[in-house]
Curated annotation (Swiss-Prot):
InterPro entries reported for this sequence: RibonucZ/Hydroxyglut_hydro, UPF0173_UPF0282_UlaG_hydrolase, UPF0282_hydrls
Protein name (record): UPF0282 protein Pars_1056
Homology family: Belongs to the UPF0282 family.
Disulfide-bonded cysteines: none
Length: 306
């Protein structure tokens, strides 16, 4: 199994895009990228805008190779929109380059909030225009040669009852490795993501960690991460919300110690690529201080919760 990180906070953008290739199938998980419209009262620095364009180019390139593309939920950093956006590095045709003719395993709208349901409607229409085959994936399973792809039931995007709605996780097994992609569970804080992992018994876990930068109470998230380590993967990739905090390692020190004791490698997307973390969003204030730049006009319709 080949695992290639594409975009994520350690690579300078908001994303969890990941490319996975087995002997039988090529999958691009969550083909999206975006930037926080405001952080520390500042809009994206030009270096962030440049990085978003770079990641978008890689998403388009890998999408054209992929057989399957996923949409775990309808936040803008997890799918390619059908309209132009500076913060998502799209024009009006980008979605066709990403989704055109592809099989898209996507979150069902059945239990979505109004905001995500509206985005689902727009994306579903765009997928039809692009000639994609959209499949609601919640709880489903697909066998392609010797590879099995499995989707979880809906999981909370953070604590139960969260206004940010629900997501789905994906597991890929090729008979040697078992990877589970668990986006935006914000820890996790609820037991259901851990239960899904216990069923799959993954060798590699890619999980959206807790948003420590928002001042969260961490105890439940740290406990869940410890439970994931105890399942016994050889690699735990911590991603997304957690890496919007420059001090994230210090705040999860107990988890890192547990992983070391159990022989579990803890990595970031950048680390998997052999690169240093570049937490550009968390560095935004410092970037403006070191490299002063005129603030770009705010992009309408984009909010912090996306």
């Amino acid at each position: 199994m080949e695992i290639l990180p594409v975009g994520e906070e350690s690579l300078g953008v908001r994303s969890m895009c990941l490319y996975v290739e087995t002997r039988d199938v090529r999958i691009l998980f969550d083909a999206g990228v975006s930037l926080a419209p405001r952080r520390f009262g500042l809009p994206p620095h030009p270096r962030e805008l440049e990085r978003a364009r770079s990641v978008r180019g890689e998403i388009v390139r890998l999408a054209q190779q992929a057989d399957i593309i996923t949409v775990s939920h309808y936040h803008r950093d997890h799918f390619t929109p059908w309209y132009p956006s500076v913060y998502m590095a799209t024009d009006g045709e980008t979605y066709k380059k990403v989704y055109g003719g592809k099989k898209v395993l996507m979150k069902s709208p059945a239990d979505l909030n109004w905001s995500q349901r509206r985005r689902h409607y727009g994306l579903a229409k765009a997928l039809q225009e692009a000639g994609a085959k959209a499949v609601y994936a919640d709880g489903g399973e697909w066998r392609i040669g010797g590879t099995v792809i499995r989707a979880s039931p809906p999981l909370w995007h953070g604590p139960a009852g969260s206004k940010t709605g629900r997501v789905i996780a994906f597991a890929v097994s090729d008979g040697e490795e078992r990877l589970v992609f668990v986006p935006d569970v914000e820890g996790p804080v609820e037991p259901e993501p851990v239960a899904f992992l216990e069923e799959v018994k993954p060798t590699v876990v890619v999980v959206g960690g807790p948003p420590t930068y928002l001042g969260w109470e961490l105890e439940r998230a740290l406990q869940r991460l410890t439970e994931i380590i105890d399942i016994g993967p050889h690699t735990l990739v911590l991603a997304h919300h957690l890496l919007r905090d420059l001090a994230w390692r210090e705040k999860i020190e107990a988890v890192l110690q547990r992983a070391e004791k159990r022989g579990v490698r803890v990595a970031t997307y950048a680390g998997l690529l052999g690169r240093k973390d570049e937490l550009l969003e968390a560095m935004r204030r410092d970037l403006y201080a070191a490299e002063p730049a005129a603030a770009q006009p705010a992009e309408e319709g984009i909010d912090e919760g996306d």
